[in-house]
Regions:
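N-terminal small-domain helix-loop-helix segment of the aminotransferase-like
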Residues: 2-98, 105
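Short acidic capping loops at alpha-helix termini that bridge into adjacent secondary structure
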Residues: 38-39, 89-93, 113-116, 160, ...
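PLP-dependent aminotransferase class I/II
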Residues: 53, 74, 222-306
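PLP-dependent aminotransferase-like
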Residues: 109-166
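Active-site pre-lysine segment of PLP-dependent enzymes
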Residues: 132, 150-160, 172-195, 199-232
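Conserved PLP-binding catalytic core of the aspartate aminotransferase-like
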Residues: 288, 297-330, 346
Length: 369
């Protein structure tokens, strides 16, 4: 097929971008294999298998009455709640259509052609995609034990570097950086380099392992802390995340964001979710038990895996394409990660106990051929 006539007129850096590959939807697999959607187990996208709290469901139902009206562009109530929870001024908070939005807003505000952004090998693939979209150059630093090599990343920072991305815990490998090492790295960076600390999986850490990253913003005005309601809070479908940063940085991001980037239902859901800390802690404990179940099962199968601090585990299965195809045929969805430079590995989300059992049974069959 001939390319559309307009394609040659798009910038080279746009045409060079590889599209983001999302986890396969349940409905898509059901269509492909003629399966009953209710029998499919999806462990591909690091979603909370419990879903949102009952209070969140009620808040969303109540907010439906506001559908004819535009959302509050400044999300007053949600920002106020986050301000109280995090002990920061509301002017330091930027809301996003998922935390992806925060990452992209940083690149929109601070990157242009000729600039560089630094990130680790095997880190979240949105970092290079968002960098490429601005015509900037991504500098991928080789991983160390599947995680961030902070010394090498610091050495990769040059006069052209405008942004550095760090994920803690890292996706898709699940590695974690101790707070002391993380702060030392942030403190070593030039103050004119924006460092984005992506904490999408922060709530899955044992509380004593969580970095006081929001407090660091006062010391490091070039720090942006990004978090999401998509994971532990169970709001993936509603797309709401937030960033905490110096007010001057927040002002720039608010200048380039869409005016209604977080919808009314998402704002209501996030506000209710934030108020239910017990539900999030219960989700963390369930995840810990599920992780132990998966790790034990992988050990029985003799599979190598990367110890994870998130709600997922990366397992080396050999011919990942063939194993994944077998899992799909059995109605189990996991995440191939060849596009992360890990062609022999699959990322498996921690599910409910019965979902984990289903995965391990299907994986056993897939490995036996």
């Amino acid at each position: 097929m001939n390319p559309p006539a307009l394609a040659p007129h798009a910038p080279d850096h746009v045409r060079a971008i590889s599209r983001y590959i999302a986890g396969k939807p349940i409905e898509e697999l059901a269509r492909e294999f003629g399966l009953d959607p209710s029998t499919i187990v999806k462990l591909a996208s690091n979603e909370n298998p419990r879903g949102p709290a009952p209070t969140v469901r009620a808040a969303v139902a109540a907010a439906v009455a506001e559908l004819p009206r535009y959302p509050d562009s400044n999300a007053f109530a949600l920002k106020a709640a986050l301000s109280r929870r995090l002990a920061v001024d509301e002017t330091q908070i930027v809301l996003g259509n998922g935390s992806n939005d925060i990452l992209e807003l940083v690149t929109l505000a601070f990157l242009q052609p000729g600039d560089e952004a630094v990130y680790a090998q095997h880190a979240f693939i949105v970092y290079p995609l968002a960098t490429q979209a601005r015509g900037a150059r991504g500098i991928e630093v080789p991983a160390r034990d599947y995680g961030h090599d902070l010394q090498a990343m610091r050495a990769a920072v040059t006069a052209k570097t405008r942004v550095v991305f760090i994920a803690n815990p890292n996706n898709p490998t699940g590695t974690w950086i101790a707070p002391a090492a993380l702060e030392a790295f942030i403190g070593s960076l030039p103050r004119d380099v924006v460092v984005v600390l992506d904490e999408a999986y922060n709530e899955y850490l044992v509380p004593t392992d969580r970095a006081p990253s929001v407090e660091w913003v006062a010391r490091y005005p070039n720090l942006v802390v990004s978090r999401t309601f998509s994971k532990a809070y169970g709001l993936a479908a509603l797309r709401v995340g937030y960033g905490v940063m110096d007010a001057s940085v927040a002002d720039l991001l608010n200048r380039v964001r869409q005016p209604f980037n977080v919808n009314t239902l998402a704002q209501a859901a996030a506000l209710a979710a934030l108020a239910d800390a017990d539900y999030v802690e219960e989700s963390r404990l369930l995840n810990d038990a599920g992780m132990a179940q998966l790790e034990a099962g992988l050990q029985v199968l003799g599979l190598r895996y990367v110890p994870s601090r998130g709600n997922f585990v990366l397992a080396q299965v050999g011919d990942a394409g063939a194993v994944n195809a077998s899992l799909l045929a059995q109605g189990v969805i996991v995440r191939p990660v060849a596009n992360y430079g890990l062609p022999q590995w699959l990322r498996i989300t921690v599910g409910l106990p019965e979902e984990n059992t289903r995965l391990l049974t299907a994986l056993t069959k897939a490995l036996r051929g």
